[in-house]
Amino acid sequence: MSLNNIHAEWLSLVDISGPFLAIPVLTHTFPQGLEVLSSFKRRRLRQAYDEWREALELEDPQLEELHSAWIDEVLSRVLEFDDDGKGDVLKREEWCRSHLKSVLPDQGVVEYPDLAVVDEQQDNKPLLLIHTYKPNVELESTVKYEGWITTPADRMVQLCRSLGCRLGLLTNGECWMLVDAPVGAVTSFSSWYARLWSQEPITLQAFVHLLGIRRFFVDESEQLPALFDASLKYQDEVTDALGEQVCRAVEVLIQSLDKADQDRNRELLHDVNETELYEAALAVMMRLVFLLSAEEQGLLLLGDECYESNYAISTLRMQLRQEPSELLERRWDAWTRLLSTFRAVYGGVEHEELRLPALGSSLFDPDHFPFLEGRTKGSNWKIDTAVPLPINNRTVLLLLESIQLFQGRTLSYRALDVEQIGYVYEGLLERTVKRAAEVTLELNATKKAQSPWVTLAELDSVSMDGTEQLIELLHERSGSSISKIRNDLSKLIDDSLIERLLITCQGDTKLRDRIKPYVHLLRTDPWGYPLVYPAGSFIVTSGSNRRETGTHYTPKSLTEAIVAETLTPLTYIGPTEGIPREKWQLKSSSELLTLKICDPAMGSGAFLVQTCRWLADRLVESWTLAEESGKKISVDGYILGTSSTQEYLPHDTDARIVIARRLIAERCLYGVDLNPLAVELAKLSIWLVTLAKDRPFGFLEHNLRCGDSLLGIERIDQLTQFSMNPTAQGQKHLFSDEIECAVDEAVVLRQQLRKMTIRDIHDVESMGELNSLAEVRLKITRCIADAYIGEVLMAQGNGTDLEKALAHLSIQVRDVIQGNTEQLELIKQRALTALSFELSVGKASRRPFHWPLEFPEVFSLDGGFDCIVGNPPFLGGQKITGAMGDCYREYLVNTIACGKRGSADLVAYFFIKANALLCSSGFFGLIAVNTISEGNTREIGLDSILRCGSVIYRANPNLVWPGKANVVTSSVFVSKSNWNAPFYISGQQVPVISSALTQRENWQPVKLK
């Protein structure tokens, strides 16, 4: 077996979460492979394990002693930390209590390891911290330590970081979890299981090879921290490769849908546009990811024979693998099974053989993409007959393997972070679907190729100009070298490839013969068929390049730090007043549940996911404090009166965490993104961290919205006065009362929605009805706002033109308010035209986001958000016009920057907008490129924020982005109210922080006379 296969094998048997050791690093560091244990040591270990398991199963009265002996056997003998019993390297609990005690500042508890591996040559420097637990303690389940609610795994992370020791090992006897907790980076968790050590000896070999005593005393470059660091450079490559794998699967699914459409004379998808088709394919992949995660976490019916055999996604891949390959292409029952499972999850199952509560959600709604079931638009899944598409089992197997396998390893969705899933799937947001106007060939291109497609007509035409011109065209489109193209053009074509090409051409021999000279240049599908798209076919192409527009996925290490830093002064009494940490007071659960936190450029929801986790932990702590004072907490998270008959909060800590996360997600989180697919991905991310058994999906439609965060009104009086800079003395229009009344009614409806508790699908449906009523009430107002912003865009700062346009719009609005539906249609058309100003033909119109209309309860009642976090797009000031148009840049300058000109990066306008969207006591924490503190970007962004009275209380300037994006960033934390606590730059206390993110006052340039 090759070294790569050896490492791939044991890695597939270990549960891994977060970045781990890369195979290239393992093969380079261990060229001889893994060390083989002596037969004596293996027998002794097996005997000790069997004795421990027997004592555990029989509840032996000496279990505690046997448990300690078993753990000591592994640490002292197998890993050889204390083989001679002298205790030079492995220090016991009493020593650790004296020498490795640490007060965790954020939790206010004293911690120390149970054991520690130390280097006695370096003043007993700790190399590995160890925690041991009783056999019944799950290492990833939440438990309570002295009022601190955490998991054993997270407890070890905090201890490692507080003591400056990267590595930790924790065990309950069965599971042995290694923790790598580098400061400022993502934590890695990897778990070995003792029961596998005899069944799969290679896992024991890897465990001993990586954690044996010799690994801690070899050259520093071969120690575990160095190996983890060396593996990081492969992490992006692995994630990108997995993302590409999923992208290919989406392509195959769309090609299958296209073929089904061709077989039905293009009637199936005749009313489905390209965007819908791509969204449907992506929805299928997102459904599969959710179901795999839910099944692995035991939240569906995995284990039930009926479910496993007929519905489960986790078992389907292996069932299909057992079918002969020739049958996979000729059977279609797997696609029907997927559709049945999607329906079961959405609508529930009530049968004597199978019971599954309805989970609902727009993601699984069968009527959202009815063509997936062979139904027409407008049909009803409960009434109309479905005719499942002839998508063969081979295609379904490919879909499943793309998300379940990577480099031969089975991916564990229980171990994968939601952020990792988001990172993979966010790459899909850059793709779209287009129809081929004529026969189009897809070239086997390099990764750098921007447009690897060429029409057959183009090839025929350029061929007439000679071979050199043909080669030049193919080189330009594919990115391949000239020599490779020459070789491919002259290469012989075997009969099997000609036959596959004929099948691709649907038996058209003339078409085959025209394409044949180029066949070696074409990319093939996963089964070796050249990719040829007939006229009218759907092609997956690159759409908006999110990275070119400055959009980058935020690594977990950054989201964790920014969320904690921004939310801490919001959730505790003390940080803003400068009170010592030990005297801070956590706010009550009712106060925490009224907080409103927003990410105005949420992407796949990384910041919202971390906010949900962090704030839920604080909420559980708040409940615990309330109960310790004798109070009772309802299952809805509120403190109960003495005579209340409401259901109490469960005692189980894990159940509390889930309840807390669901409450935070439904009541506290808000998000916006310009890309509708990103909004759906953000919903998926939050659903994945709020999964609860027998509970439906949380209702998120009202709080996660689609639109342009910078384009639109942020105050309702901007609309009632038709002015982007309204004043208290400003003149309201005659229609202002109707607008304000509509907003007030929407607020009442959304407040009712927020108070609802989700028990089953009927509660979700009721919330959906309330949300729809609020949407209907604001429909006309939103249309007026769109038209108004459209006129502001088109005027490009010309006050006279804008005044004339708004005078005419005011007359139309008055007629609409009086019930003139024709005028309403005219206003809609007017808005569409204005919002498409300067956009190229075929490009979707701009989508304004009107904050007081989308989130009316936030701005009508509270005056803004309590907190804003996020990673706005990194787009240079010189690129804004090219990417978004002259009128858009003029809009930014005139409405957001209040007329201040300069080549400011786009992020400066996000900073100004964030500050404006906060309530008077709010905070924001945002990431920006380091130019946020330089030149025009600083003057237009941070300078204007500070002039408004806000304060920068913490900054981390000039940080290299921990990923592929070649940027240097700064994270900036701002308080809109007074800040009476210390200020910090890169962790160092300073007297003040200027807009240059230094402690020196800014020197402003003055023009010489």
Please state what every model-predicted region is.
Residues 1-9, 107-110, 132-141, 146, ...:
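Signature of N6-adenine DNA methyltransferases within the class I
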Residues 1-166, 184, 227-231, 240:
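A short, conserved, highly charged catalytic patch centered on acidic carboxylates
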Residues 11-37, 42, 281, 292-294, ...:
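S-adenosyl-L-methionine-dependent nucleic acid methyltransferase catalytic domains
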Residues 60-106, 136-139, 228-286, 290-292, ...:
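Class I S-adenosyl-L-methionine
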Residues 111, 126, 167, 412, ...:
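Core residues of folded domains in eukaryotic genome-function proteins
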Residues 115, 176-178, 540:
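Short beta-strand motif preference
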Residues 123-124, 350, 534, 680, ...:
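Short loop/turn segments at connectors of secondary-structure elements within structured domains
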Residues 202-219, 245, 249-504, 552, ...:
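Nucleic-acid modification enzymes, centered on SAM-dependent nucleic-acid methyltransferases
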